[in-house]
Amino acid sequence: MKTACFPVFRNRLPDLDRDLDRDTKRVCGIKLTHDGAIAVVEDGRLVFCTEQEKRNNNSRYQEINNLDAVVAALAENGVNARDVDQFVIDGWDGEAESRFKVLSGETPVILRGAPYVERHAEGLLDWIGGSGLTLGDRVFSYRSYPHVTSHVASAYCTSPFAKSGDPALCLVWDGCIFPQLYHVEGKRASFVKSLFPVTGQAYAAAGHYFGPYKQTSRGGWDLGVAGKLMAFVALGSVHVRIVAVFQKLYQEHFAGDTALACAFRANINNSESSLAAVHDFFAASALQLGQRRPKTCLHRLIFSSNVSSLTKWRTLQHHPLPGARNLCIAGGCGLNIKWNSALRQTGLFDSVWVPPFPNDSGSAIGAACCEIVAQQGFVPLDWSVYSGPSLQDRQVPAGWHASPCSISEVAAILASNKPVVFLSGRTELGPRALGGRSILAAATSPEMKDHLNEIKFREHFRPVAPICLEDRAPDIFSPGTPDPYMLFDHQTKMPWQDKVPAVVHLDGSARLQTISRNSQHKVAEVLVEYEKLTGIPLLCNTSANYHGRGFFPSAAAACEWGRVEHVWCDGMLYRKPSATA
């Protein structure tokens, strides 16, 4: 079968005064590789973002290997590809450009895109263009910006700094790069510095050598391991001797003047060789540490390097950049709530913003934002976290009883210590369930955490997050500040650790999500009604999905899964035959 291959062209930063660019109204961003997604921005407003893992019980991190998925996502949201003014493909691995092999229907297509990282300090908005995006029976031109640019754009444009027009720093730490610091102001963004020479994939790679996910092979990359290890570190403690081993090997392999370290830094844009170097580091660590369990020590060492580098940079800066006390965090490492919280607590920044999709689940949004930024500068995006796919209308399995059910009745079921699959409105964006595709449960018994982990086939040490009314959070948690996207760590205050044990992690922390009691989302109403019945303003909140797959796309999918007896979906309650109300 013949492969369609189309010419590409390159350009530098577009002329911001070009009339052609100013006429662009509807932009479609596409992320083809893992965490594949399609997003449409129209007149500065996010219309929708369809992450592939959230369609049809697809596998987590689902890529787009057939461009028919783009056509389908557009059609599901009432958009014809011909009505899109500009398509933008997120860049990927490659020093000069990336290359994507996909299908359009049954026809193989090769698309070329921008590289992973900008090629010079002012090159974030340098783009590569092509004309081979085959959607249905039509071929469209497209642009592609560096992958890192999409992280910067999605983080800043969704931030409060963009709304107020204030400059900010943006820290991007992704799988294949060192933590990179950028400065965003007005119509420009520029690279400031790399903080230290450790790639984001190091945290997950450690799982091949230490802890419950240890394996003998270097293959079989699991994108979910990093998050699981974030929970696992609560089982350990810091040991000076173990940290010393890591520090010594860190200098030898990554940061020092050895031939090994210099070669690693020189070849950072080669993803295969950089990953091999990370594996070599952990293999050497495992050999020296033997049976000792160093995961918590590694976590502490990497974070200390981050803070130390930021502090040193701030101290040595003779001419402070505007907005240097505002920080956006993006990249896959932005999902690490321990690091996010510690950065927020350093005192280096007045305000820290992490979007609900800091990892590649936000890259399609970021790709669309890149085009807006190229035209207008770093303007704010009008967006909602509940902009994913709508619920599908499918027939539930035979035997399930369906009846109308009010929010107060849902609260009563929860107060009787029965979990409820809660499906409402459009899917939330990003990897965290935020009340749109959640399993809710009372947090008043420690057994509930074990039960939720069991029905979801999760390890016993995995935490269950609380969703709490915003105005009550400071009573229960420290700091208890508003955190609507579950991306920071909070300590549970002692009087409440016995009241809500199901949401207290092994180290006393909680991955808190707050929501205003005046929110229009139905999950806020549930919390208000539950508080009236019990005096407790929070519930357990964990994602509603098959193990290893995206959120349930319908009530029917939740019933087919069948591991929770009550499924509530936009006003209807579905009960398993054996269940009691």
Swiss-Prot record:
UniProt-recorded name of the protein: Nodulation protein U
Query: Domain of life of the organism in this record?
Result: Bacteria
Keyword check for Transferase? yes
Q: Which family does it belong to?
A: Belongs to the NodU/CmcH family.
Identify the coding gene: nodU
Q: Which Gene3D superfamilies has this protein been placed in? A: 3.30.420.40, Carbamoyltransferase, C-terminal domain
Q: Name one GO molecular function term.
A: transferase activity
Q: Which CDD domains match?
A: ASKHA_NBD_NodU_N
Q: Does the keyword Transferase apply?
A: yes
Mind telling me which Pfam families this protein's record contains?
Carbam_trans_C, Carbam_trans_N
Q: Name one GO biological process term.
A: biosynthetic process
Keyword annotations of the record: Nodulation, Transferase
Q: Which InterPro entries does this chain map to?
A: Carbam_trans_C, Carbam_trans_C_sf, Carbtransf_dom, NodU/CmcH_Carbamoyltrnsfr, Nodul_NodU
Function noted in UniProt: Involved in 6-O-carbamoylation of Nod-factors.
Which EC number(s) does the record attach to this protein? 2.1.3.-
